[in-house]
Amino acid sequence: AAVMAAGLTACGSGADTASAASPAADSTAAESTEAAADTAAPDGDGDPTTLTVAMECAYAPYNWTQNDDANGAVEIRGSSDYAYGYDVMMAKKIGEALGQKVQIVKLDWDSLIPAVMSGDVDCVIAGQSITAERAAQVDFSDPYYYASIVTLTKKDSAYANAASVADLAGATATSQLGTIWYDTCLPQIEDANVLSATANAPDMLMSLNAGKCDIVVTDQPTGKGALIAYPDFVMLDFGGAEGDFQVTNEEINIGISMKKGNTEL
């Protein structure tokens, strides 16, 4: 049977409480490809020579949409656009190890897990945290990234010099729907005015840029990318200290999800 590069496991690491960890990517592909050539995933588009991978294509730097194949971008199924980013690079490495061509499927965040469960796609590589709730629905690889939490605000904001979560008290805040940034981190800000969640990361950043909120909470790679796109932003990293957002290890472990019992991957 084919072996997925990251190694299959039903859940992430333990749920001991921890502050935001430093990022440490482990995107090494499987060393052996001989076994991979013999067996292919049965789901996805039904083509045993294709690895069908779902992602938002709107979560830079993990994944994004562009109009050409520059830098090795992969065409999005049913579209003239292409996808690229860390997650696409990971998908291509796995495809190489399995001897399969990678096909990218663009889906909304809330549609990713259902697509895996139904077999519409082989796997999801989309900056997904390995939470207990998700692991009850799908299988996960070992983590390939450990996300760290940051806060974005504007340089002229009253919160630009915040040194801890406590300093964010009273802020108007938002983040992306269905993420730990919105569900777990924002409630930790005292007296925060928490707005409705945004549909995706670009909408989140545009809300901050338009002055609809004082701060947004996200992960470090997204934050660094935002600083390039929005020069008026400043990124606050509380360094995983006691004054940082408190999260469990499972919430910051990023893995690849696949259908329960999919031993081929």
Range-by-range predicted roles:
Residues 8-25:
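Bacterial lipoprotein signal-peptidase II cleavage site
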Residues 44-128:
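Extracytoplasmic small-molecule ligand-binding "clamshell" domains
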Residues 52-54, 73-80, 164-179, 192-194:
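Short loop->beta-strand "edge-of-pocket" segments that line small-molecule binding or catalytic clefts
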Residues 86-88, 103-115, 160, 195-210, ...:
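Short helix-initiation/N-cap motifs at beta->coil->alpha
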Residues 88-97, 155-157, 170-172, 179, ...:
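Extended ligand-binding regions for polar small-molecule ligands
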Residues 96, 101-167, 242-249:
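Acidic, polar ligand-binding/catalytic clefts
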Residues 111, 127-137, 183-188, 214-250:
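A ligand-binding cleft/hinge motif common to bilobed small-molecule-binding domains
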Residues 146-153, 229-265:
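Periplasmic-binding protein-like
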